[in-house]
Amino acid sequence: MADLRNRRNVLVGAPDVQASGGITVGPALKESTNFPTDATQELDSALNHVAAGYVSEDGVVKTVDRSTEKIKDWNGDTVVITQSDHSVTLQVTFLEGANGEVLKMIAGENNVTVEGDTVRVVDNADELPHRSIAFYINGGNGSRILVFAPDAQVTEVGETTYVRSDVVKYQATMECFGVDNTKLISLIKRAEDDSVRATGGADGADTESAGAEDASTEDAGASA
């Protein structure tokens, strides 16, 4: 049986640092008009995205929680399964402790002021702002991934530690809200180079055909 595995479908999660460092944020969207449609194209300038800077080596973690409930009959058999909840969250650790845009996400829009080299942050009970956020990922072998949340809000921030042996960082968990029934978009541009395919599949067949043609050419040369 032919080996139909395809390395074009194998992706890594490295950041595309050429795309604003790999992560950008902007105002939350209210409709899908300006949603991205191509992992290789820049976001619409109308989204007003700016760089969010360095993130930790843990990258970005997506969690999809789909809670269900089994409805059973008198005999204890499952009759139907209902869905009671669905949520999408993102977790990322920001490493730029003085990045104003990041601080506004985790402390509040009106609680951060930047004047020259001075950044002032106030912690209070203000509701945190909603933002759109994009992650640009280099999938390897020329492939690209764009993960885009049109409306996300930070719901939890980890402890901030000030020590000599580490940088000041903010671990943020964000809830993704639906915009036109879309909470999160993942766009994938696969590698175009057929050389990354596994040996023995369709490419293997092509190689065998090429080998047969080469053999025929050699035989013809010997006959001449």
Regions found by a protein language model. Name each.
Residues 21-48, 79-91, 116-130:
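N-terminal short leaders/motifs
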Residues 143-224:
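Mixed-charge, glycine-accented linear interaction segment located at domain edges/termini
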